[in-house]
């Protein structure tokens, strides 16, 4: 992108609505409740021929530095310092407040270009608020309606004037790896090659877990900076925020998500939106790190989150966080491994790593587990190897006989990866018991080294050409 723009203003003036309008999709949560946005969220904006990086920020308020609102303010000020230009959004419908005046003074002291944006200008009675905005001393306000998309051409012109035409329209080459590409399903039936794993491809990783498990602290430790808002309060994160960083030459895009509580406890509309946003992050990710609080692990909600991730077909890694607070580490680790195997039978062999997001202990091992798990998630096995394996499995444990007739498994192939899925041609596929399917899945995990990922097997019986004749007679 040619330049970076921060959207700033007091709470509930429509900053996230404008952000969503500029990126062309609903990335930021929007609600009437003030203070929905807490972390700074970047996005790729397009506006009438302009392309730039846009940053949504928390509403600015006067607050003590150590309070939650104070830490939110620090995140917003960091975005202003990072940006080349600020869009200062005021509410033309409800008029100015003393907070607007204080923010205008703060932006003036920064000495960076500012575009004053009078949002909600479509509302009846907004003229008074629009003209009041002149008193802020930041030049002529640009009237817009972020909700209805009005005034976008004027906003484009104001940005170009503030940043300069040469800077506004500067071209920049975009590498292929900068483009988000959804997981592909272009693997063809019966393909007999086992392609090498691409260790240079950018990797999307979602960090999920219960509230206050230490997800944001973990990502901040990876980044080496206080990029995400953290604190003792549960439920600080609301939006799913993505950040990029480099690990040993590979681009990692991590998604911080809101803490996920049991559905029965989620009553507020805003929390429901946050959980839905976290679910979207899981579906977009390739590997999901499920963060447990090692001091109180394996709550019922932890198990449900693991089950959800596996049902979505994602590669999963368990991270037992707050390891710095554990005293008898060897005994606790042995207990955690026993409980993992017992309580998560559907995730047999899943990688589980003790870590401390606070101190950074164990993070290299966690990243290597993420890479190894993604390698398995992308794994392809040749048809020839699969059919030799299938023959051996049937010799060791033949399929059961149903009504005196033994089921025959004739042919096996991998139909897709991400996650690995297989098709087996057999007789009487509808009669094959679930226990035999589990036997085959466990065999695939053990013989082809495939822990930590969901494995799916589909059975198909060949069409019987005489079936229609039987029905006619």
Curated annotation (Swiss-Prot):
Coiled coil: none
Source species, domain of life: Bacteria
Pfam annotation, one family: KH_dom-like
Domain EngA-type G: 3-167, 203-378
Cited PROSITE patterns: G_ENGA
Residue numbers binding GTP 1: 9-16, 56-60, 119-122
GO BP, sorted A to Z: ribosome biogenesis
Keyword GTP-binding: yes
SUPFAM superfamilies xrefs: P-loop containing nucleoside triphosphate hydrolases
Protein name in the entry: GTPase Der
């Amino acid at each position: 992108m040619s330049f970076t723009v921060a959207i700033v203003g007091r709470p509930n003036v429509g900053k996230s609505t404008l952000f969503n309008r500029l990126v062309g999709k609903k990335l930021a949560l929007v609600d009437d409740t003030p203070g929905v946005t807490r972390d700074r969220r970047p996005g790729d904006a397009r506006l009438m021929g302009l392309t730039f990086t846009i940053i949504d920020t928390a509403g600015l308020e006067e607050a003590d530095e150590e309070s939650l609102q104070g830490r939110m303010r620090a995140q917003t000020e960091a975005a202003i310092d990072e940006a080349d230009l600020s869009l200062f959004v005021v509410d033309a419908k409800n008029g100015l407040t003393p907070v607007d005046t204080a923010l205008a003074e703060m932006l003036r002291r920064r000495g960076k270009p500012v575009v004053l944006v009078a949002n909600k200008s479509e509302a009846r009675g907004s003229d008074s608020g629009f003209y009041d905005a002149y008193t802020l001393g930041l030049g002529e306000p640009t009237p817009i309606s972020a909700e209805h998309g009005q005034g976008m051409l004027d906003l484009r012109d104001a940005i170009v004037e503030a940043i300069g035409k040469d800077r506004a329209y500067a071209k920049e080459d975009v590498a292929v790896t900068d483009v988000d590409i959804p997981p592909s399903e272009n693997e063809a039936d019966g393909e007999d090659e086992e392609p090498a794993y691409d260790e240079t491809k950018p990797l999307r990783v979602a960090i999920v877990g219960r509230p206050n498990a230490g997800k944001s602290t973990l990502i901040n430790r990876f980044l080496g900076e206080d990029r995400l808002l953290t604190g003792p309060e549960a439920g600080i994160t609301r939006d799913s925020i993505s950040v990029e960083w480099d690990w040993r030459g590979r681009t990692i895009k991590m998604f911080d998500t809101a803490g996920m509580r049991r559905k029965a406890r989620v009553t507020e509309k805003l929390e429901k939106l946050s959980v839905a946003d976290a679910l979207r992050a899981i579906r977009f990710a390739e590997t999901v790190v499920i963060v447990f609080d090692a001091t109180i692990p394996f709550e019922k909600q932890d198990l449900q989150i693991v089950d959800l991730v596996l049902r979505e077909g994602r590669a999963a890694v368990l991270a037992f966080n707050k390891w710095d607070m554990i005293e008898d580490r060897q005994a606790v680790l042995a207990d955690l491994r026993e409980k993992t195997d017992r309580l998560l039978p559907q995730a047999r062999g899943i990688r589980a790593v003790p870590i401390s997001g606070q101190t950074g202990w164990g993070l290299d091992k966690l990243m290597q587990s993420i890479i190894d798990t993604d390698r398995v998630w992308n794994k392809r096995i040749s048809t020839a190897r699969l059919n030799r394996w299938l023959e051996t499995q049937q010799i060791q444990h033949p399929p059961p006989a149903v009504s005196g007739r033994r089921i025959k498994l004739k042919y096996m192939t991998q139909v897709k990866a991400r996650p690995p899925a297989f098709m087996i041609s057999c007789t009487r596929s509808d009669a094959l018991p679930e226990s035999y399917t589990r036997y085959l899945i466990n065999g695939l995990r053990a013989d082809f080294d495939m822990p930590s990922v969901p494995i799916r097997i589909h059975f198909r019986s060949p069409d019987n050409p005489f079936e229609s004749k039987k029905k006619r007679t």
